[in-house]
Amino acid sequence: EKAGIGKSIDAIKRADIVLLVLDASEPISVQDQQLGGFLRENTKSTIIVLNKWDLVENTMMRKVSPDGKKKGGLADKDSDAFKNDFKQNIYASFPHLDFAPIIFTSAKTKYKIHLIFPLIFRAWTERHTIVPEDELKEFFKKVVKEHRPSRGKGTKHPDIVSFHQLHNNPPMFEMMIKFQTSIHFSYVRYMENRLRE
C-alpha cells in the first residue's frame, strides 16, 4: 500500500488536474483521506470520481414528505435525494475538497463515463482563468459589504488594504491587510469559497 501511495503522490505532483477515483461500494480509507489532503495542500484541481456505482445497493433512507413528516421508504440510488446524501457523506470525509465536483460512474457498465471529460475541460478553464481587475474590485466590495472581515489575534478589526490576482494555473490571489491587524483564517476560507462561486 505504501508503494501505491508513493506512486500516487508522485503522479499528483506532476499533474494540474487530478481525478480522485473512489470505490463507491467501499468505505473511505485513511489513505484516501491522506491523498485528498495532499491534493488540497498542493493546489490541484480535483474531480472526485465515485466508481462502481453499479455495486451500490438501493438503501433504506428516511424520506420526507411535502408536509415535512418523516417516513421510511426505499430510496432509489439514482434519485437526486440519494445522490445528494451520498455527496454530503463524501464531503464530510473530505472537508478540504468541498469545492471538487463529484461524479457517479461505473467503468464496468460505462455509466456516466462520458461526463468526466467535460468536467476536466471545465477544471482546466477555471484553473487558467484571469479575473479582470475591475471585476475583482467589484467582487471584493460586494463580499466585504456582505460579510465584514473577522479578526484573528488582537483587538483591532482588520482592514483589507488590497486584493488582487497574482497569477493563474493555479489561480492565486493576494489579500493585504493593515499593519498590526490580523484576519481570521475562516474569513480567508470564506473569500476562497466565494471566488470559486
PLM regions: where:
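C-terminal-of-GTPase-core extension/linker across diverse P-loop GTPases
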Residues: 1-10, 14-20, 26-197
